[in-house]
């Protein structure tokens, strides 16, 4: 019987794409990248997103450190445009990590589904995001008060989809995997990781990604979770 609901944060509750995009446009303007050969913010964002995803994959695989990720993603983006300026990359990286968590765009129906679920279940977060950043996001977006435990990969010592982070989460809460459901947008990290550990899972799948995993439900809007819980 499900008693505890674990949510992913980025791209599930907190709209990472919108918040990140808006901050990157701001940084393109603030650091006058148009004067350095990057004529449109969309060019900057397109290349950054590709490089950032590659860096996050390396970080999840423990191939680079948190500090490497923060340094390389902007340095490599600028280098793509022929800008070899370590200080500029460091400055942009610092501004991004400092400012982006204060942006508060959430997915539709976040508070509606939280209000529905919290009367029936205990709610928690499991996230691969950085400890200090995720807590700021949640506080600024008025999410913190709704969740009993906020499990970060840094605190758990492992990143999703590794079973260690799910083991840490259920031990922290004091339940078994069978009592839990994981809700997230990442098919590998959130859904496959949780299912392999023995949890049930609901796939937040707004882009209608096809898959063969045995899940409790697929939803394109968070409010649809009501049909399964």
List where the protein language model places each region.
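Asp-based, Mg2+/Mn2+-dependent phosphohydrolase catalytic module
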Residues: 1-5, 17-18, 115, 130-229
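A generic structural signal for short
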Residues: 62-63, 102, 123, 154, ...
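N-terminal helical cap/lid subdomain that shapes the substrate entry/recognition surface
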Residues: 2-108
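Catalytic-core regions built around general acid/base machinery
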Residues: 109-120
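Glycine-centered short loops/turns at secondary-structure junctions
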Residues: 120-121, 198
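Short, conserved clusters of charged catalytic residues that mark active-site
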Residues: 108-109, 164
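Conserved phosphate-coupling serine/threonine residues in phosphotransfer and NTP-handling enzymes
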Residues: 127
């Amino acid at each position: 019987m499900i008693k505890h609901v674990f949510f992913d944060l980025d791209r599930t509750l907190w709209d990472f794409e919108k918040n990140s995009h808006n901050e990157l446009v701001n940084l393109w303007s603030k650091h006058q990248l148009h004067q350095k050969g990057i004529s449109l913010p969309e060019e900057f964002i397109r290349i950054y997103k590709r490089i950032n995803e590659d860096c996050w994959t390396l970080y999840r695989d423990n191939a680079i450190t948190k500090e490497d990720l923060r340094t390389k993603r902007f340095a490599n983006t600028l280098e793509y445009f022929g800008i070899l300026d370590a200080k500029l990359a460091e400055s942009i990286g610092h501004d991004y990590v400092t400012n982006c968590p204060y942006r508060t765009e959430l997915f539709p129906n976040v508070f509606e589904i939280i209000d529905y679920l919290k009367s029936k279940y205990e709610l928690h977060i499991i996230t691969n995001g950085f400890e200090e950043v995720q807590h700021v996001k949640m506080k600024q977006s008025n999410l913190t008060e709704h969740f009993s435990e906020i499990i970060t990969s840094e605190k758990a010592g492992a990143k999703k989809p590794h079973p260690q982070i799910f083991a840490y989460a259920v031990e922290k809460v004091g339940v078994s995997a069978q009592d839990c459901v994981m809700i997230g947008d990442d098919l590998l990290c959130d859904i496959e990781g949780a299912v392999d550990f023995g949890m049930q899972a609901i796939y937040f799948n707004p882009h209608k990604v096809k898959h063969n995993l045995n899940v409790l439900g697929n939803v394109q809007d968070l409010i649809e979770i009501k049909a399964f819980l």
